[in-house]
Amino acid sequence: MEYFENRDRAESFGEAAQDYDAFRPKYPAALVAAIMEAAEASAGPDDRAPRILDVGSGTGILASQLRTAGAEILAVEPDPAMAELARPKGLEVEVSAFEDWDPQSRTFDLVSFGQSFHWVDPSVALPTIRTVLTPGGTLALAWNDIEPIGELKTRLDATAARFHTDGRTASLGTAGAEDTFAHVEHPAIAQLRGAGFSPKETTFVDNLHYSKHDWLSMVFTYSAQLTMDPVKRAVMREEMSAEIPEDGLDARNEALLVLASA
């Protein structure tokens, strides 16, 4: 089953909107700068702010970073609870699944997806993206992928595996097998090429430190945990907590950016 076909997981985030906004990470500054460079190139030399459509915007984490960097943003988000947390950040948000969204003849220099492209049907989304991009416009797909550093990762993965016997792990990775980052071509690349886009991948690495509370709070905003039985989820959190030192953990974000020209 593709991620976008699993509606229980795709529609699970609203119940955790506050924690999602508080604990999901921002994107590396260099990744945001790369998106802005592409958007400004698409906008041309007339000194206007680049227009960006941010799809599956959630609580506006990526969108607010792009707005701060100087872009004019329209966010599209299917979950009303998530959208309500994005609007106070100064974002215009339209509540809709992207597959049902009406562009109303509007066009954009860049279309971005932050941690969200896997939740849309590419056979519907990619043709729509083509219609809303200005000539020379760019599609940007971004995923944060944060893992503990060292042997703690092995212990936490083993704990997650005991609770997710279907092969899911605690977070959504960006490439290779489901929920696991691997240094192989991202599966979206073939979808983009098949739709006539020319994609290029870049990875941005940030070294991070998390308190025990913040790490666990982040992990339990992922759909693999949000769709668990609540009692089972609480036990999993307790067992993971027992593995993490009181002073927290070091982690690495290998954030992936795919820029694709139409």
Question: Residue spans of the language-model regions?
Answer:
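A structural alpha-helix within SAM-dependent methyltransferase catalytic domains
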Residues: 36, 64-67, 126, 130
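A short SAM/SAH-binding and catalytic strip from SAM-dependent methyltransferases
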Residues: 109-123
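Residues lining the SAM
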Residues: 76, 113-114, 142-144
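Conserved Class I S-adenosyl-L-methionine
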Residues: 179-262
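A short acidic, Gly/Pro-enriched loop at the edge of an enzyme's catalytic core
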Residues: 100-111
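Class I SAM-dependent methyltransferase SAM/SAH-binding core
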Residues: 51-55, 59-101
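Conserved class I S-adenosyl-L-methionine
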Residues: 1-47
